[in-house]
From Swiss-Prot:
UniProt record similarity statement: Belongs to the PDCD5 family.
One GO cellular component term noted in the UniProt record for this chain: cytosol
Cited SUPFAM superfamilies: Double-stranded DNA-binding domain (SSF46950)
Keywords for this protein: DNA-binding
Top-level taxon in the UniProt lineage: Archaea
Protein name: DNA-binding protein LS215_1892
MF GO annotations: DNA binding
Length: 118
C-alpha cells in the first residue's frame, strides 16, 4: 500500500534537487578555480625553473606531493620578491632542498627520558 505523496513532499524534493544542483555548481566552480590556479602556477614555474629543475620538482611531487606543493609556493614567492636569481637551475634547486633538509633535521629532536624500574 503506497502512501499518497503530499504537496509538502513534492516541495521538499524540489528543494533538495535545487540544493544538490547548487552544491554541484559550487563544486564545479571550485574545481575550475583550482585548475586555473594550478595552470598559472605551472606557467610561473616554467619561467623560474630550468627544464632540469622542473623535472626534479616533478619527481619530488610524485613522492611527496604536499612537500612539493609547499616548495613550489616558496620558490614562486622567492622569485616574485626578487630574493632568488631566475631561472633556478637544478644545482640551485638541490642546494635549496639541502637547506630545507638541514633545517628539518635541526627541528626534529628526539628526547629520551630514562625511567627507573619500580
Amino acid at each position: 500500500m503506497s502512501a499518497p505523496t503530499s504537496y509538502d513532499d513534492e516541495e521538499l524534493e524540489e528543494l533538495l534537487r535545487r540544493k544538490a544542483a547548487q552544491e554541484q555548481k559550487r563544486l564545479e566552480e571550485e574545481r575550475k578555480r583550482k585548475a586555473e590556479l594550478e595552470s598559472q602556477k605551472e606557467s610561473i614555474l616554467r619561467v623560474i625553473l630550468t627544464p632540469e629543475a622542473r623535472q626534479r620538482l616533478t619527481n619530488i611531487k610524485l613522492v611527496k606531493p604536499e612537500f612539493a606543493e609547499s616548495l613550489e609556493n616558496q620558490l614562486i614567492a622567492l622569485a616574485q620578491s626578487g630574493r632568488i636569481k631566475v631561472p633556478i637551475t637544478d644545482e640551485e634547486l638541490k642546494q635549496i632542498l639541502e637547506q630545507i633538509s638541514e633545517q628539518n633535521r635541526r627541528d626534529f629532536k628526539i628526547q629520551i627520558r630514562e625511567r627507573g624500574w619500580k
